Amino acid sequence: MAVGKNKRLTKGGKKGAKKKIVDPFSKKDWYDVKAPAMFNIRNLGKTLVTRTQGTKIASDGLKGRVFEVSLADLQNDEVAFRKFKLITEDVQGKNCLTNFHGMDLTRDKMCSMVKKWQTMIEAHVDVKTTDGYLLRLFCVGFTKKRNNQIRKTSYAQHQQVRQIRKKMMEIMSREVQTNDLKEVVNKLIPDSIGKDIEKACQSIYPLHDVYARKVKMLKKPKFELGKLMELHGEGGGSGKPAADETGAKVERADGYEPPVQESV
């Protein structure tokens, strides 16, 4: 063997020497996730992203990230079977500003409502809000016994089911078409749509456990930062300054000059 051809010796290291282990978290940053102003609790938690390196920007990795949060955590409430999806639309400093992206009921709640001896009625409709968001709403309701009913079962006839389904679609369309996304979310939080449907269908067949069980976001308008800031209560539409930020006029004598400071 020729001299100087032993590659292992020239490199000066053992074969299979261990690489230096780098902690992956040392290259990452924590960002705060902020919910829109419709909810009582704005700070949802934190999310992790790799720091900006070259052309790979951290904020691009955060945009489009979806968070699923229980309504109980958003409203500091006991009722925990409603889940809201929030999507990151912009990053300001260390804050991820989110917007509504969908709603769902928990699996255990849906399973607890389905029982024997009653009719389950479902409906869905695609509706556009006044500010251009296309939503698909799903509704569910169950028949219940009439007052003083002795019979064990409470099944609705096919014609009644069709009437109730038609009424569900009408109410869902009306509630969404006439409002913008912010007002629609404000109706989904207490589920006033489900209560309206229950009230309207009493004349056809008594219902209970009526809920807007799911909301899907199908299409969004072009992203506008101003609208997102309004949702987060930071970009006031009026343009007026806050009470404590307004300036006051100061009276000065003619020919007034400020004193010369010794040090700056």
Curated annotation (Swiss-Prot):
Biased composition (Basic and acidic residues): 242-255
Gene Ontology annotations of biological process type: ribosomal small subunit biogenesis; translation
Highest taxon listed in the record's lineage: Eukaryota
Classification via InterPro entries: Ribosomal_eS1 (IPR001593), Ribosomal_eS1_CS (IPR018281), Ribosomal_eS1_euk (IPR027500)
Annotated Gene Ontology cellular component terms: cytosol; cytosolic small ribosomal subunit; nucleolus; small-subunit processome
GO molecular function: structural constituent of ribosome
Subcellular location as annotated: Cytoplasm; Nucleus; Nucleus, Nucleolus
Main location: cytoplasm
The entry's keywords: Cytoplasm, Nucleus, Ribonucleoprotein, Ribosomal protein
Region named Disordered: 233-264
PANTHER family: 40S RIBOSOMAL PROTEIN S3A (PTHR11830)
Family designation: Belongs to the eukaryotic ribosomal protein eS1 family.
Function of the molecule: Component of the small ribosomal subunit. The ribosome is a large ribonucleoprotein complex responsible for the synthesis of proteins in the cell. Part of the small subunit (SSU) processome, first precursor of the small eukaryotic ribosomal subunit. During the assembly of the SSU processome in the nucleolus, many ribosome biogenesis factors, an RNA chaperone and ribosomal proteins associate with the nascent pre-rRNA and work in concert to generate RNA folding, modifications, rearrangements and cleavage as well as targeted degradation of pre-ribosomal RNA by the RNA exosome.
Subunit structure: Component of the small ribosomal subunit. Mature ribosomes consist of a small (40S) and a large (60S) subunit. The 40S subunit contains about 33 different proteins and 1 molecule of RNA (18S). The 60S subunit contains about 49 different proteins and 3 molecules of RNA (28S, 5.8S and 5S). Part of the small subunit (SSU) processome, composed of more than 70 proteins and the RNA chaperone small nucleolar RNA (snoRNA) U3.
Protein's name in the database: Small ribosomal subunit protein eS1B
The encoding gene: rps3a-b
